[in-house]
Amino acid sequence: MKKYLAITSKGLENLLADELIALGVTDPKVVHAGVKFEAPIEVVYRCCLWSRIASRFIQILSEFDVRDDMDLYLGASSINWPSYFSADKTLVVDFNGTNREIRNSQYGALKVKDAIVDRFTKADLPRPNISKVEPDLRVHMRLSGEKGILGFDLVGSGLHQRGYRTEAGRAPLRETLAAALVMRSTWDESKPLLDPMCGSGTLLIEAALMACEMAPGVKREKWCFEALNDFDAELWAEIRSEARVKSRRGVKKVDARFYGFDRDYRVIQTARENARRAGVEDLITFDVGDATKVERPEGFENGVILCNPPYGERLSTEPALIALYSEFGRQLKEVFGGCTASIYSSNDDLLACLRMRADKQFKLNNGALPCVQKNYSITESAERKEAVSVEVAPEFMNRLKKNIGKIGKWARKEKLDCYRIYDADLPDYNAAIDVYKDYIIIQEYAAPKTISEDKARRRLTDMIRATVLVTGVETNNVILKVRQKQSGKNQYQKLAEKSRYFDVEEYGVKLIVNLQDYLDTGLFLDHKLTRKMLGEMAAGKDFLNLFAYTGSATVHAACGGAKSTMTIDMSRTYLEWAQKNMNTNGQTGTQHQFLQADCLQWLQQADGEFDLIFIDPPTFSNSKRMEQTFDVQRDHIMLLENLKRMLRENGTIVFSNNKRNFKMDDAALEKAGLKAKNISKQTLPLDFARNKHIHNCWIITHKED
């Protein structure tokens, strides 16, 4: 009997060996990412047609040592290629692996191709043609260290290509992997199966194909073994016909029901089309639904929930996933008692958010990504009901409810879309939580080194889940940021390219925010009363805004009736943002000027006069584009002296900064001919009442003679 190699994903070797035994293979040998076996051609044909988890079947022609390219060429030349296929067949060489001497797979493929062609030409036969587009034959060369395996790929394109899927949702599973997940779950044909995040429906379709005993390769039209000289067309036709009959009968006798849900209607439509092409559309019910709210279908006794939820590369950047897994775990325990769940993910931290203990787990890669499949029993006991009723982080939840009751009422009265509902009120939950219309931003302060990473992560997941429960916010609308002490050079750090801008309202003014592209959102919430005050002071006045950021103070001044405005910032991005803010509020006249400049340098040489000046400089800055460093404690008098030249006789400077323990140098200020009034308390809004030092704010005017 000839030798063969069945290739599969790492972690599925033993499962594949069991499958091959069921298909008639005797004594299979498990190897890395595959199974070796010997079998008659009838069994091989059945394996190609019926294997659900093999990606390819290789007929092994030779195994030999490969130390260098000469060994490779001689090993390939030793095979009598014309005895296997005729020269009129097209072929391609697939070369997998490298070693110390053969470092390029394309070079390795070229040497094998040369050896094949040379065997034909030396036998006075025509050269076979090489074609990378739908070749008749694929020659497979696998190199691992100094060991090589050379043979024919009997399949052609991978066996995961069943023919029913032409498009998929985001990050689709390969059909072979999906079939393995079904096999490793607790599902069998006697149980209903539900996928609450079904995407394009691959898991459910693969399970349905198993239930109706439909061969996964039955719709496949081309097989590379058909181009070999020893191809037995009559035997193959008999095996395929037998499979088709079995499939037709199987569809009619299936009792199992399958249910798929996804939030995306377009993906559900794709899943329905895939099921139709697979011939199992009558077995699967697809519908739009949220996994965190999915209800138990009627008759779903002892059912199985199987899914592949989304998983981010880093927990800290995927708060929506923390909320999703937490809420999904709660829903499973609350609604699906007596059932089992099988969840596949690359992220153990996210699986921990389910708050469920796995009965079994299997390591199984998704491509190159290490993943794990965990099976859970969902108990229906009193213990389960008690666990469901326990609040997550009750102390934190109670504080959040109290804050929302008080601050939410105030925000609605003041017509504010954006406000803070929690600001590290409790030492164990060290974060700030802000509402931005329909979104929640959780800004986690970096945990001290004395707190273990596991404990900090658990507190974070508790906070996120509790916030979702208390606020009712959609899980996709939760955004997490980690706040650390910012140096001047990264005070407005760019985080990602997501470009999600939308309008919010603040005291009748519309302002544009972006919650994800930058560490800050475009709106400093602690200054909402300061901006309101500037709007009330600005009527008929010439207004100057320095270190303007996104110009929100300018918008308030303009909407308050300012005669003119000048907005200055060093960042072109933020100046353009400021212009959009003004345009959104209909403030588009030429009396509103915007200037990109180093504010410190501009102040030293600028002229012009203003009635109202707002300046909110950084605490410290050493930006490469600034000619000098700036320290607000050290340099505030110099700053105010420069502003004095531009301040009209009855004018006002509103000076603010965020330095804790800032001290105004009253003596130096008086010497400069200015006087100051501290209005920090008056500009502290209710949502920042606990944080007395969030900012300092002063009214600066000319000293009376």
From Swiss-Prot:
InterPro entries: 23SrRNA_methyltr_KL, DNA_methylase_N6_adenine_CS, RlmKL-like_Mtase, RlmKL-like_Mtase_CS, RlmL_1st, SAM-dep_methyl-trfase, SAM-dependent_MTases_sf, THUMP_dom. It catalyses: guanosine(2445) in 23S rRNA + S-adenosyl-L-methionine = N(2)-methylguanosine(2445) in 23S rRNA + S-adenosyl-L-homocysteine + H(+); guanosine(2069) in 23S rRNA + S-adenosyl-L-methionine = N(2)-methylguanosine(2069) in 23S rRNA + S-adenosyl-L-homocysteine + H(+). GO terms for molecular function: 23S rRNA (guanine(2445)-N(2))-methyltransferase activity; RNA binding; rRNA (guanine-N7-)-methyltransferase activity. Its EC number is 2.1.1.173, 2.1.1.264. It is found in: Cytoplasm. Gene3D superfamilies: 3.30.2130.30, RNA methyltransferase domain (HRMD) like, Vaccinia Virus protein VP39. CDD domains: AdoMet_MTases, THUMP_AdoMetMT. It is an enzyme of class 2 (transferase). GO terms for cellular component: cytoplasm. Coiled coil: none annotated. Its main location: cytoplasm. Keywords: Cytoplasm, Methyltransferase, RNA-binding, rRNA processing, S-adenosyl-L-methionine, Transferase. Residues 43-154 form the THUMP domain. The keyword Ribosomal protein does not apply. Specifically methylates the guanine in position 2445 (m2G2445) and the guanine in position 2069 (m7G2069) of 23S rRNA. HAMAP family: 23SrRNA_methyltr_KL. Belongs to the methyltransferase superfamily. RlmKL family. PANTHER family: RIBOSOMAL RNA LARGE SUBUNIT METHYLTRANSFERASE K/L, RIBOSOMAL RNA LARGE SUBUNIT METHYLTRANSFERASE K_L. This is Ribosomal RNA large subunit methyltransferase K/L. The gene is rlmL.
